[in-house]
């Protein structure tokens, strides 16, 4: 993306951030009104999990190669990414993630980088075919464990089509709920209004979020999960920070206020002290990790792209569980929040070496 395009995107961010929240009409694509049940008592404990599934390779390397004037580096970068996808073996990793869901039993699971990868290089004389649907693989792994997690909502995000369509990647966000315990009253997935858009030939960066208004044991709980824009080599950091703040601000405005319990989770791609963080804190949300683990870093990102590091090499905390409406009268949040995929014992057997379940740690929070 050239400097002029970044400037246009920045103006769009500012204009969106300054607008009043849009009124949403019943029947529109973003209609989020659901029955709000305020039964007596209420559920004593709600468990949630957020996990970036990880596409399996460093896609930024491919984007950077496509963005250079030298076409000679495009295919080597793509070939390296495909080889890395094989080494990071999502069909094996999904078993570990499904096992963690089975062990912890969350009411809702927010998922990011839920990828659909379709590669067929046989027309080029290369005997390589990859066909992976991350969501279908996860649902199958959960069903094998006797679990009934249903897809409440998905959003369509990054879309990549290369080599004349022989290489395709579509990225989604998804929200799963345990259908045996959670009633979904309304749900939706949508793209954010502000996005980077096309950043290289065949590569369009769109980010989105998903939500569900639910009833659990007679009490209303809203779950939302998001994956705002990530840092991208060559893009101004300040612009990306403002894009993330605008994206999260849009989500907060459309979830709405009130006394209803809300859990907002995901790979939010920014750290404490960022504009994104300020938007959530200013809207009355509580950073659950910080509330329950004051003074503890709780880093969540990132393992090496090939997942080969023997000890976690995290250097930032960008995965979160934020809550509203769960605080006690004294302002405290009761429960627990832990990481998954952060210690060597979480690794599993890969095709060539031990690998991590994802390049991000997952979070599991129990809210009382």
Residue ranges: model-predicted function:
Residues 53-57, 114-118, 156-160, 181-182, ...:
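Solvent-exposed loop/turn segments at secondary-structure junctions
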Residues 14-17:
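C-terminal motif of bacterial Sec signal peptides marking the signal peptidase cleavage site
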Residues 19-36, 181-188, 253-263, 268-368:
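Metal-dependent phosphoester-hydrolase catalytic domains
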Residues 19-163, 245-248, 366-368:
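N-terminal, active-site-proximal structural segment of metallo-dependent hydrolase catalytic domains
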Residues 46-53, 93, 97-124, 176, ...:
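Active-site beta-strand/loop signature of hydrolases that rely on acidic residues for catalysis
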Residues 80-87, 190-201, 228-241:
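Surface-exposed cleft-lining segments at the edges of enzyme active sites
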Residues 1-7:
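Bacterial N-terminal signal peptides that target proteins for export
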Residues 29-31, 142-143, 151-221, 225, ...:
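A well-ordered secondary-structure block
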């Amino acid at each position: 993306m050239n400097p002029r395009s970044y400037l246009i995107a920045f103006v769009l961010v500012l204009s969106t951030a300054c607008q009043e929240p849009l009124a949403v009409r019943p029947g529109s694509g973003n209609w989020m009104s659901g029955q709000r049940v305020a039964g007596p008592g209420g559920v004593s404990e709600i468990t949630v999990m957020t996990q970036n599934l990880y596409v399996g390779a460093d896609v930024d390397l491919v984007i950077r190669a496509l963005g250079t004037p030298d076409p000679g580096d495009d295919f080597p970068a793509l070939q390296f990414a495909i080889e890395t996808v094989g080494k990071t073996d999502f069909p094996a990793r999904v078993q570990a993630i499904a096992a963690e869901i089975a062990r912890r039993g969350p009411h809702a699971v927010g998922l990011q980088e839920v990828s659909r990868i379709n590669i067929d290089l046989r027309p080029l004389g290369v005997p390589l075919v990859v066909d992976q649907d991350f969501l279908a693989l996860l649902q199958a792994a959960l069903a094998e464990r006797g679990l009934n997690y249903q897809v409440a909502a998905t959003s369509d995000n990054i879309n990549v089509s290369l080599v004349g369509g022989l290489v395709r990647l579509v990225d989604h966000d998804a929200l799963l709920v345990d259908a045996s315990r959670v009633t979904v009253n309304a749900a939706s997935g949508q793209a954010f209004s502000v996005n980077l858009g096309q950043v290289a030939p065949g590569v369009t960066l769109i980010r989105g979020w998903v939500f569900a208004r639910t009833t659990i044991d007679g009490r209303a709980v809203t779950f939302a999960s998001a994956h705002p824009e990530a840092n991208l080599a060559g893009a101004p950091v300040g612009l990306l920070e403002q894009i993330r703040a605008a994206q999260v601000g849009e989500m907060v405005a459309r979830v709405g206020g009130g006394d209803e319990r809300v859990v907002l989770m995901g790979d939010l791609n920014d750290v404490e002290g960022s504009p994104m963080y300020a938007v959530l804190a200013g809207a009355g949300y509580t950073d659950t990790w910080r509330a329950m683990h004051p003074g503890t870093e709780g880093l969540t990102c990132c393992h090496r792209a090939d997942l080969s590091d023997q000890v976690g090499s995290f250097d930032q905390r960008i995965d979160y569980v934020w809550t509203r409406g769960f605080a006690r009268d004294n302002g405290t949040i009761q429960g627990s929040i832990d990481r998954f995929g952060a210690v060597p014992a979480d690794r599993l057997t890969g095709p060539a070496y031990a690998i991590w379940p994802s390049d991000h740690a997952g979070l599991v929070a129990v809210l009382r």
